[in-house]
Amino acid sequence: MIGGGILLMVAALCLTGFNVWDGWRAGRESQKVLEQMAGNTVENRTDLSGVSELSGEEKRLPVIPVDGNDYIGVLEIPDQNLALPVMEDWSYPKLRIAPCRYKGSAEEKDLIIAGHNYDRHFGGLKQLSPGDPVEFTDVEGICYRYEVAEVLTMEGTAVEEMETGDWD
């Protein structure tokens, strides 16, 4: 019985250690991408805005390609000293690197960014307060400024509420 308890404690410590390491890794990856994005010039950017309206696909945005992933801009939360690259489209493996555009665009005022709760990513969002500034700068250098109106915790399955909420 004691051996089983010790085994469970060791497993819990290993899991905690992995989670801490994974958060550190994600923060390092995001910073590496930011550095590479900063070195890109307008000539190195890819304009993917020519997707046919008839195709039913969402309009693609100008991007900066870095290590096989396309990035649409940088999200900054000054009060948390946080700057993160934002990938053009999302998947679970991509969320392990950086926040991702879930849907929409800043220009159309319907941008939804999905992110992981790593300490070096979105882990501190729950500490934001109404009035805190948030900025998104796209790869063309256009800065969209926002202000936190409310901090709301939603279930991970609340996709419809997230997509249809009146957030602006």
Each predicted region: which residue ranges?
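Solvent-exposed, non-transmembrane regions of membrane-associated and secreted proteins
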Residues: 2-168
